[in-house]
């Protein structure tokens, strides 16, 4: 059987794919990868569909071993080695039977991904292999000794891709659906404050500190639907942005909603990091979501075999002139 054995990993390591859609009306959370573009990049590097199940790491990496198989592997967001051999960022590699696969801590963010050719073939639950920890739907966190079955065609030719530059700028949101219970001062403070991500943030919610957002009419409402991206404000006035593992209903007013593509960016801000929000119109939010889908769908066409020479298009897409100095000014 093609499989990976877990030898070591951090407590926040789970299997995630594109998420569990269509079941929120039954009280089932979406789950899924916290950074969908990073998941897609890792999968395309090993020849998988962008939304295929992979291993998601939270801050801490892990160590794995292949069982009776040769598979393509790739990591995005962390340093990867196969039998001690460093694998360049943006490139997949083949791992033979019994190979040791090591993933380092997350670099420049919170979440990193290990994709394996053929994908993680754990039993699907409601159309997804994503783990939702609080309900145990899809299983639970990974630990030493766990064995991850792999799908077929895992030894596909590994690929390489120029990794995109990190997107900068404020996190975009739309006011509402319940911005009316807040004072004008609260609405202004939401986009004028440098917010700090608190250590208690997790896959369920990103807790922020930096200002108190006053309620105009109390903080309790009749519970209604929430979605990933909803910005709830409880009684202490400090906002909580709901993330992929969030519940399906809530009883705090929702001052705003973070747009989908920027929720992935927010997920990668580490505890102690700062974020700023900017309000956008619905048309911009819809356009941003469409652009992310188009970007993910187009990744496979950009991929090249990992050992091939770079094309002229690849070279033009990369910044190859780093560290230039003026020699005449030295000495």
Language-model region placement:
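Conserved "landmark" site that anchors the functional core of diverse proteins
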Residues: 1-331
